[in-house]
Regions:
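Glycine-rich, charge-decorated loop segments at or immediately adjacent to ligand/cofactor-binding or catalytic sites
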Residues: 42-48, 76, 248, 271-278, ...
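Acidic, Ser/Thr-rich peripheral helices and adjacent loops at domain boundaries
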Residues: 42-59, 280-288, 345-361
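Conserved thiamine diphosphate
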Residues: 59-72, 278-327, 331, 354-358
Length: 362
């Protein structure tokens, strides 16, 4: 699983209040870039710092780079007739230029943004671009940084790409699997963040023989899916951690009756009801063992928003070909994160074999 994590590597603190508010988000040994021109006695008092943190040892666990951005921007635009207020408001571009140098990022996209943003104010275009370049050049000339961090360009396979978010990719994978299996989709769910929009997305694809049902609770949702699978549909439900706990008994029934349903667990943080808008990957053991008796299920986990497509397709294939429930683990970060997705050629995907009973026994 690839994730940027929850902690910052670099914190730009333009004033004492910003430092106090955001310091907890900076990882130990992270870099603090501060505009010391704003660390005045008045600002320190307003933000409840007893001493100037740039001058005592309270930030000893971090690497502090304190510089007078206001003066440096003033020097960069000294030939322009600008107010002190306007110069101060441009210091953020100085900081952005410095960070761009630290991460070896070209300034061209930012310069184009500035030109478009302030197209009707040429003086703002000029001062912001000068401040941006001043910050970039400052990083290139001082000796505070031993090395820069180069983020190389992504290498893409040839083909047609589109931007896709994780939950959308899951839906496309389910629909593609149903087409390859020659089955209708029956999806039932109860609204729960961050899985709710799967129901909303699938509801827009009735032309692909997708039937959707918003149930009154989590148990009703999965039990209706059990019934739909028994009648020959590709049955799917989606939930998050709290709903997964409620679905346990019904999932055990699907195991006992060898019904190939698919459960999408879009994980969120915390026990019990949890935190709807926070992400976590803590439901693996619950998914593997959170049912009474011998009730094994196949568990797959996506590793990126684009991979959600392949994971959903594979989940349906395994479920239908081996007559067993499959649980797909995603999370809020993947569900709402986006990335370029290589649209696969339909012929490159395998046909899915089904085991539908078409005539009476005997």
């Amino acid at each position: 699983i690839g994730t940027p994590g929850d902690k910052l590597d670099v914190l730009v603190a333009m004033n004492p209040a910003a430092l106090k508010t955001n310091l907890a988000d900076l990882k130990t040994s992270g870099i603090i870039i501060a505009n010391k021109a704003n660390y005045t006695d008045k600002n320190l008092k307003l933000s409840r710092w007893e001493l100037n943190p740039l001058e005592d040892d309270s930030l000893r666990d971090y690497r502090v780079i304190a510089l007078d951005m206001t003066r440096l921007v003033s020097n960069a635009v000294e030939d322009m007739d600008l107010s002190v207020k306007l110069i101060s408001r441009s210091t953020n571009m100085f900081a952005l230029g410095l960070v761009s140098w630290m991460y070896d990022r070209t300034l061209d996209p930012t310069i184009n943004f500035i030109k478009n943003k302030f197209a009707k104010r040429p003086e703002l275009v000029e001062v912001n671009i000068r401040a941006l370049k001043a910050g970039y050049n400052y990083g290139d000339t001082i000796e505070e940084f031993q090395h820069i961090i180069t983020v190389s360009k992504a290498e893409f396979e040839p083909g047609v790409y589109r931007n896709i978010v994780g939950n959308q990719a899951l839906c496309f994978g389910l629909i593609t699997a149903a087409e390859k299996a020659g089955l209708d989709i029956y999806f039932a769910g109860y609204p729960i963040t961050p899985a709710s929009d799967i129901l909303q997305i699938l509801s827009g694809y009735k032309n692909f023989r997708v039937k959707t049902f918003q149930a009154e609770d989590e148990i009703a949702a999965i039990m209706s899916v059990v019934g739909a699978v028994f009648c020959g549909d590709l049955g799917i439900t989606a939930t998050s951690g709290p709903g997964m706990a409620l679905k346990g008994e019904s999932l055990g029934l699907a195991v006992a009756t060898e019904l190939p349903l698919v459960v999408l667990n879009i994980q969120r943080a915390g026990p019990s009801t949890g935190m709807p808008t926070k992400t976590e990957q803590a439901d693996l053991l619950q998914t593997l063992f959170g049912r009474n008796g011998e009730s094994p299920v196949v568990v797959l986990a996506a590793n990126s928003p684009a991979d959600c497509f392949s994971t959903a397709f594979e989940a349906c294939r395994i479920a239908l070909e081996h007559m067993i429930p499959v649980v797909v683990l995603s999370d809020a970060f993947l569900a709402h994160g986006s990335e370029p997705w290589l649209i696969p050629q339909t012929k490159s995907l395998p046909k899915i074999r089904t085991h539908l009973v078409e005539k009476p026994n005997g």
